[in-house]
Structure formats: structure tokens, C-alpha cells
Amino acid sequence: MTTFHVAGFPRVGAKRELKFAQERYWRGEIAEQDLLEIAQKLREINWKHQAAANADFVAVADFTFYDHILDLQVATGAIPARFGFDSQNLSLNEYFQLARGNQTQFAIEMTKWFDTNYHYLVPEFTKNTEFKANPAHYVQQIREAKALGFKFKPTIVGPLTFLWLGKEKGEAFNRFELLAKLVPVYVEILNALVAEGAEWIQIDEPALAVDLPTEWIEAYKAVYTTLKEKVKAKLLLATYFGSVAEHAPLLKGLPVDGLHIDLVRAPAQLAAFEDYNKVLSVGVIDGRNIWRANLNQVLDVVEPLKAKFGENLWIAPSCSLLHTPYDLEVETQLKANKPELYSWLAFTLQKVQELRVIKTALEQGRGAVQAELDASQAAADARANSKEIHRPEVAERLANLPTDADKRKSPFAERIAKQNAWLNLPLLPTTNIGSFPQTVEIRQARAKFKKGELSVADYEAAMKKEIEFVVRRQEELDLDVLVHGEAERNDMVEYFGELLDGFAFTKFGWVQSYGSRCVKPPVIYGDVVRPEPMTVRWSQYAQSLTNKVMKGMLTGPVTILQWSFVRNDIPRSTVCKQIGVALSDEVLDLEKAGIKVIQIDEPAIREGLPLKRADWDAYLQWAGEAFRLSYMGVQDDTQIHTHMCYSEFNDILPAIAGLDADVITIETSRSDMELLTAFGDFKYPNDIGPGVYDIHSPRVPKAEEIERLLRKALNVVPKERLWVNPDCGLKTRGWPETIAQLEVMMEVTKKLRAELN
């Protein structure tokens, strides 16, 4: 027998049922009991799908109403004291307030779950954090699964990863010191699961795939010795998202009953675990991407392992399936329009069926599943040879780029002099990051146009009306460099994906980003080409309305890559450079059309950093090159802007400077300009526009707040190189606060200008 198991399933449901139920509950349209019943139904459906695929265990304790790390904060009693809630008797309403904030407390901070596009809620630890077990949420799920007759395996994030993912608050201390207090509470939680009949418990320690300090690594032995001694269940220690080969001696010596390793992200690490003498669970189906596996190739890897490990070989997805959409079969439109592409994909329900085939082949031989293996092989062969994917001219163009293709003609000092000569901007020039409010009217017009209820002419007229409105408001505010407002764009990545060859879109390919927010990433399946201009006519129209400078707006190659499902048959770096080269055609067309200030947004450049420091340089090298390729060939007097929004720059500043954008605008208001200090210390050479107010809130900042931030900025950046702008785009704001916020920004800028002049 070969054990097949899953670490977790998507929580939101095939049609985002959980999202819609949560939002109705928050609006007071359904009662708590209704939400609980919908959630229970979704869990039951998930378990039935796993059982139907012949899984030996169904995953329990993986379901959450918002986030699994928030659930763990509740289960360990580690919720922030500032809320004043009792973790032992937390209501569902209070649970949601932790995630979303309330009148007196801001929400728990959110950040990316390792290098995925899922966000978790960051635990807040203080020196005096006291832990207290409350496993009710997990116990409830086990009882439901038992009542339905399923054999189950709970999955819970382990104590070291849980601590690692948190942040210290208040008095200075090292959160590692809390480990001794946390482990006994884990023992209590795990024993509550054992009392419900859990024979195996999966404990996830993905932190093992990052650069952990030595004391953290060394703690694994003591922690797992304690857990094994005091918990009467078999423990499966799971790692994923990267290689843990360097820790193989430690992991193989831990007193656990099995290990799970990710062979999709790190196939080479298998060699380090082939002599393991307990259960080895191998993640052989990609839990993070949507491509169908070549099952013959997977069997080539696992059949020798079966011969060696026998019943101790387990098979699984590489990680939780939370990161993949639910079911390919509902994509009837994709199947009709792109049948070949459809045949290359596998969503969650298809992935568990792939594991069923592998399990059957290992138990009964390949002949027992020959038809499925043949279909898998045919899809793999078709994909390898498809004309739709492989366009020789794209590879040729990349191969023949001159060695200095990604370099500007002249250094910044010479370029900026030429730019200033024609731009003729005042000191502290003002601009916006790009988008303006997406009103109900804009969204309705776009929806009607997509459904065919609005003609091309009527849709374009509606968008032009909106663009004119945005231009006039900016003129009234007396901003210096204007934007067209992006009314025609649904999303900063999807918009470009729809206009570039090599991209496709699903209708129901939603994955959870956080809480009730889901995203539907584009699918990059083939070589990327820009068949025709994408933004030129909109920017040209906007420029025709005003004598002020109009800025063109594009999304950069790294962000498009990061926020998509990316093909896995060529390196990500190659895909990224293809996108950069395709965007360069757009940049040159904008320049030709008289748009000579062009912003290329890269909010996701930091997100792409590999988990291990040793791999950073290689990534930053190709990401930087792809960005620079996106503006290759522009004239010195064309001004390239970029925008970035996140809070940690210090460790990648040389790479940011290496992008060689003439102007960088960054999100800094919420960190009180702290970020700028790093730019100052580094002596960042080009122009900078630090955000002077937070666009995530409808609040209108006071003049003195913006003035204080700008004066702080002037202490770091020479006045000749300082721009003034909001933190980010204004898409999610309403018009009244947008105008009021920008009025304050302009008032303060003019006051300081007069003073500096």
C-alpha cells in the first residue's frame, strides 16, 4: 500500500462561496449560524473530493474563516492584548475584528506567506506574552470529519515556524525566548487532537526552508523530543517551498515518525533523504501552480522510492493546495476557446486525481492506469511541441539583444539635465502614482462592455469622458505631471495580460489572497509578444486635453510575472525578460507619440526574492535586467519613473538603484519616512518621490502632517531631486476624499516651494 495524503485544500469553495458568505455576514445580511453552516458544508465537500480521489486521510484543521496563522494565535492564546479580548472565549465577531480592526484598534498586520501570494496575519509577541491552549476550532473540524466517517489527519503549523513568523512588540526582547512557554501549550493542543482520535498529526515547519539563525535550528531537537514524548500520536514533520537538504542530518535524527519534503520546488534534495528509515512523504504534484504533471516522469521518480521505502513511502502535493484554483472542469469557456491550453492544466480537484493515478500505479503497476498515463503523456508531448507556445522569433530576439541593450545612452546627471530643460518643472514637482477612483459608473461600463451590452464606440466615449474628468480635476488642483487615471483598466496586471500574446485568463481560477479577498491570476502559457499598442491612444488622448505634461503608465515585467501563474517549461528569468522586451515596444511607441514621461510600476520586485539569501543576487540580476529591458532604446530626454510599495528596502537598495529609473516613487507615509533614511544613507543617486500621505484610508491628512513628512524628506534628499506624491494609486478611494487629500498636498508643497525659493 502507498499512503496518499493532502496537507490542505482551498477554503473558499469552488465558486468563492465562503467569500460571499463572509461579506454578507459582515454587512449584517446573514446570521452567524448561516455562515457556520456554509463553512461546514464547504468542509464536507472538500473531504468528499479527497475521499473520492482515494486519499488515505482527509485534511482537517486546514479550514479557516480568515487565516490559519490567526487561528493558531487564538489556539495558543497569543492574540494581541491591545484588543482586550479573551482568547478562551473569543466570539466570531471578535475573531474578525482581530483581522479587520475595529473603532479603537487597527487590524493585525498582514504579510506574504513565505514567497507565495497568500497573506497571513503576523503574530504580535511581547516579552510577557502568556500562551493558553484553546484547540476548539480544530476539535470541531475533527468531530465533523469523524461524524461523516472519514479517516483524517490534522495539519497544524509548528511552534518554531509560528514564532518565526511573528514580530516583537513593546520592550526589546527576542521572541525565541518564548519557545519554552509555547511548547507545553502545543502539547496540550496536540493531545486534544489525539483525544479526538487523531493517529497521525502533520506539523508544518516551512521556516526550515529559510535562513534560520543557528539557535533556532538547534532548538528543533529539543522541541520535537518533547512533543514526541508527551503526545501519543505519530508526527509527520512537513517542510515545503524549498530545499531542507542542509538540515538533513538534523531532520533524519529527530524523534518524529515521518518527514515530508517538497520535490517540486527542490527535486535535488531527495538524495539527502534516500537513506531515511521512517515514513518519507514526497511532494510530487505542484501545490502552487496550475500545470498538469507528466505522470510518467513522476512515476520514474517514485517507483525506485517505493522499492526502497515500501509502505513507508507517502505521496502528496508539494504543499497545501490552498494556492491553486478549485476545479478546472468549470472552465467551459477556456475549454471551448483554447482546448489545447485547457488540456495542459490541473487545478486542485485534478491534482488529487493525479495523485490517485500515481497511488494506483505504485500499488498495481502502470498497466492499471495506462489510459490516464497515456493522456498525461499526450498532453505533455503536445505542450512541448506547440506552435502556440514556442515562437522562434521571440527566442531569436532575446538571443540577439546587444550586450548593452539594458543600459541608458548617458548617465543620470546628463539625462536629468536634458529632461529638466524641456520639462521646466517647479521645485518639488507634484504627480500622482497612476490610478484615480474607479467609480461605480466605470465598473458598470466595463462590465456591460465585456458582456457585449455596450458598443466599442459607447465604451470608448465613456472612458474618454472619465479621462477628461480626471485631467480637469488635476489641472484645477495645479498638479505638475498629470496621469490619465486608468479608467479603462480593470487590474494593473490583467489589463496588460489581455493585450499581450502568451497570456490566457480563467473565469473561476480564483485563489485566496487573504480573508475574503481572492485574486484570479493570469496564466502565462507561451512566448510573450505585444501584437499592437496597448496604452498609447489613451495617453495620447489625455495629453491632447492639456498643455501640462502627461505621464504614461505601465506595469513592469517583474510584477506581471509575480502576480501570474507562470509557465514551468522555461526559466522564470526568461519569461520575465520576454515581458520586458514586449513592454519596450510599448515604451518606444509612447515616446514616439509624444509621451516622454513614462512610469513602469514594480510593486512586486521585493516579493520575488528567493527564501534563501544565497539566491538573492541571481534573482536581482535578472529582475533588474528585465526591468531595464522594458525601457531599452529610449532617448536621454525621456524620463522613466518607477513606483514601489512595501516597507523593506534597506537590503536591496543597490539593486533598486541599479534599475536606473530617473525617478522612483515609494510608499513611505505609514513608516513615517523611515524608509527614506536608508535611501539617504545609501546616497541614492536619482530623483525620489516619497509618499506623503496614506491612500489606504479615506482620512484627509492635516497640512502639518504632510509638512512634517516633507521636511523630514528634505533632510535626506536634496530639494532639486525631491518629488511630492501620494503613497500609491487612488483607485480604491472615493472622489470627495481624493480631492480633499490632494488639496492639502498641494497647499503644503506650494508653501515649502515659496520658502525654498
Curated annotation (Swiss-Prot):
**What does the UniProt cofactor note say?**
Binds 1 zinc ion per subunit.
Its protein name is 5-methyltetrahydropteroyltriglutamate--homocysteine methyltransferase
Give the matching SUPFAM superfamilies: UROD/MetE-like
Where do the annotations place 5-methyltetrahydropteroyltri-L-glutamate binding?
16-19, 112, 517-518, 563, 607
Could you say which residues bind L-homocysteine here? 433-435, 486, 601
Q: Which reaction does it catalyse?
A: 5-methyltetrahydropteroyltri-L-glutamate + L-homocysteine = tetrahydropteroyltri-L-glutamate + L-methionine
Query: Cofactors per UniProt?
Result: Zn(2+)
Question: Which NCBIfam families does the record cross-reference, listed alphabetically?
Answer: met_syn_B12ind, PRK05222.1
Which positions in this protein are listed as binding L-methionine? 433-435, 486, 601
What is the annotated role of this protein in its UniProt record? Answer: Catalyzes the transfer of a methyl group from 5-methyltetrahydrofolate to homocysteine resulting in methionine formation.
Keywords noted in UniProt: Amino-acid biosynthesis, Metal-binding, Methionine biosynthesis, Methyltransferase, Repeat, Transferase, Zinc
- Which biological process, per GO, is one annotated for this protein? methionine biosynthetic process
